[in-house]
Amino acid sequence: MSIQECPESPMLEGEEGRGVERDSDRDSAVDSASEISDGGRTGEKEEGIGICLPREKGDLMHNHFEISDQSALSSASLNEEQFEDYGEGEDGDCTTSSPCPDDEIRINGCSDLGSSVSSSAGQTPRKIHNVDDQMEVFCSQCCKRVSLLSDLENRLKNLKTSSPNRKISSTAFGRKLLHNSNISSSNGSTEDLFHDSTDSSDLDITEKVSYLDKKVTELENEILMSGDVKTKLKQENIQLVHRIHELEEQLKDQETRAEKIMEDELRRHRDAYIRLEKDKNTQIELLRNRLHQLEDENGKMAMNMNRLKSQTEKLDEEKQRMTDKLEDTSLRLKDEMDLYKKMMDKLRQNRQEFQRERDTMQELIEDLRRELEHLQLYKLEAERAGRGRRSSISLSEYSSRTRESELEQEVRRLKQDNQKLREQNEDLNGQLLSLSLHEAKNLFATQTKAQSLAMEIDHASRDQLLEALKQQEEINLRLRQYMDKIILSILDHNPSILEIKN
């Protein structure tokens, strides 16, 4: 940038005032836009506006040399429309194809300062030297700050893709421009304005540089944080999507499994119901058959009851005959029992005597055996002694023979006694048979509970009759078995008891 680049042409003082006024309006509008906007887009627009500040002044002043006040107003309105488009557009940056004032500002460089100095040189030549010195200092500082701002602009352009888009209201921006233009129109002369603009531009540039630096760092941090958050959210979203898909698959599997289970349960319950129906029908059929069978049995039982009544009457008659016989046999049994007791006492005495005799005979036999052994030894000794002792041997033989004869007689007598005891034992067995008959009589006596079974049958129920009939049959069976045993034992031991005597 240099002052020589700017065209020098005479400019009226009023036009100068209007140009500076419009420049101040533009600056105030930019400041208001920087205060309203925030985030990445606000930083970008502040950077672009801050870079365009020194150049917009030259462009506007150069335009004021060629147009009138009316054209100046129309250009201001056009600029306002451009700012409105900037506030409402989708992208906050001015591209090379758009008619943005920043393109003209970047081409013209610092022509605003040169035009302001040349315009003031025609009227106030006394101040040109001081102004040139100030401009050199100002241009060197501007170059440094502009380079710094260009770096910041490049950084913001790099961050522009990830920064959020913020829109500025066109009405608010125009209202702020109008307010700042009215305030700037009331400023002093061109010289005071120039000094104020240089001082304010230095302060504004430093403040904006620091502010933009802070904004850039904040935006970088925010972008990094937002990038991390986005990656985390993307990962979480992917995980949640996978989880949703898994849960949906599980839900489908559960639904299919539940449907299968439901079908299996329905089929199982249907089969169970059919099976229960079949079982019920079979049970009903069995119960019907059982009912018919019981009815038939009931008819048969009624017929059997009549037959059993006749049989019981016959059995009563037979029982009466048997009781008479038992009474006779009981009397005989009583006599036999008395005889049996006597015989048992006699048998006990005979057994005792037989035991005593047996003991004495055993002792006698032992004595004889000892004597016989003694005689045999004596005989052997006598044979050894010689013939001279034959007379003594004959005497001993005679005595031994006499002793043997006595023993033989005793044996015969004992055999006779044994035979007698056997006969007595047989008699006692007969008496035992008579006692068994007496026991049979007692059995009959205990089992006869009533005088007439027919009367009981008339007054008893069916169950009682059946029970009594069973008991009577058991008693008769036991009596028959007992009588058979008695007869067999009599036939084996003493059949003379069964003989019929006239």
Swiss-Prot record:
Biased composition (Acidic residues): 81-93
Record-linked Pfam families: Rab11-FIP3, RBD-FIP
Disulphides: none
Location(s) in or outside the cell: Recycling endosome membrane; Cleavage furrow; Midbody; Cytoplasmic vesicle
Keywords: Cell cycle, Cell division, Coiled coil, Cytoplasmic vesicle, Endosome, Membrane, Transport
Keyword set includes Ribosomal protein: no
Coiled coil: 228-482
Basic and acidic residues bias: start-end ranges: 15-29
Domain FIP-RBD residues, every copy: 439-501
An example Gene Ontology CC term for this record: endocytic vesicle
Ranges of biased composition (kind: Polar residues): 71-80
Region Disordered, annotated ranges: 1-49, 71-98
Cell cycle listed as a keyword: yes
Topology versus the membrane: Peripheral membrane protein
Main location: membrane
MF annotations from Gene Ontology: protein homodimerization activity; small GTPase binding
Single GO BP term: endocytic recycling
Written domain comment of the UniProt record: The RBD-FIP domain mediates the interaction with Rab11 (rab11a or rab11b).
Subunit: Homodimer. Forms a complex with Rab11 (rab11a or rab11b) and arf6.
Role according to the record: Acts as a regulator of endocytic traffic by participating in membrane delivery. Required for the abscission step in cytokinesis, possibly by acting as an 'address tag' delivering recycling endosome membranes to the cleavage furrow during late cytokinesis.
Protein name: Rab11 family-interacting protein 4B
Organism: Danio rerio (Zebrafish)
Gene this chain is encoded by: rab11fip4b
